[in-house]
Each structure stands twice: as C-alpha cells, then as structure tokens.
Amino acid sequence: MIIEINETNIGDAAKVYMESWKDSHQDICSAEFIEKHDFDYMLNFLNEKIKQKYDIFIDFYNEIPVGIVGINPEDEEICLLYISPKEQGKGFGNELLEFALSKCKNPYITVLDTNKKAIDFYLKRGFVPAGNQPEPNKEKCIFERKYVYQNKNM
C-alpha cells in the first residue's frame, strides 16, 4: 500500500531511506560520509523536502515499510526511490516507480554515474541519458547524470 508520508510514518520512511542509501553508497562514498547519514540526518532531510513541497510516499507490504519515492512537483523529478535492502528484487521498486510515473507528465531522474544497479534499473524501464551535472559532494569527484523518461509502456 503506497501512501503519502506523514507524522506517524515519517520515521519508517527515514529508516528505509537510511538503510537503502547506506547500502547503495557504501562502495562509492567514504566511511565518514556514510556515517553522517544516520537516522536523524535522513529524518531531517525528508522533513526539509516536505517543507519544499515535495510529494513523498512510502510503500508498506504486510504493514512493513519496504520503500519510498519522492516527486518534486515543480519540475517532475522523481527522486528518493529507495527500497529496503532486504526487500529489493521483489517488485517494490517497479511498483513505486510506476506510481510516481502515473503522477508526472514529463518525469526525469538523476542518478550517480557510479550507481550501476540503479542505472540498469532505470534504463530497463524506459529512461534514457540526457546529460551530466556536477554532484554537490565535494569529498569525491562524483557526477550525476539526468535521465528522461521516454517509454510510456513499461
């Protein structure tokens, strides 16, 4: 069941976000940088996105939080698609992506160039590269690439 995050489930969303973010970034970021992204950091980050009017959703399966996704309604960027590491490969990523796509006319995403797993996921679902932007993380020279959605038939 996908619902908008609120005061009662934002802690669940922050936990999923923290676990998945750390798992997906462990090979590309320093241990110090990863350590900074604890529960409180992720909770504050989600609260900040909500203040910025992002629409953020959480997916529950059998009352267990399994993933999150966000949409910036200003430019239709689909962001914050994170699935709990122990729940990956079970279709929850597809479910959340399809949900987000249904709310956008011209969606796009940005992905770290080093996140091959995410890139493969998006390429298989109709996204194509659209350019590079510098990653704001100054600890490493990491780049994000913008991908636009072209395939309306997932």
Residue ranges of model-derived segments:
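Loop/helix-junction capping segments adjacent to catalytic residues or to phosphate/diphosphate-binding pockets
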Residues: G11, K90, K116
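Glycine-centered flexibility sites
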Residues: G67-G70, G89-G93, G126, G131
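Conserved acetyl-CoA-binding loop-helix of GNAT-fold acetyltransferases
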Residues: I83, G89-S102, D120-K124
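Short active-site oxyanion
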Residues: D55, K105-P107
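Acetyl-CoA-dependent GNAT
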Residues: E4-I10, K15-K86, L97-F99, E135, ...
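C-terminal "cap" of GNAT-fold acetyltransferases
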Residues: I5, Y108, L112-I119, K124-R125, ...
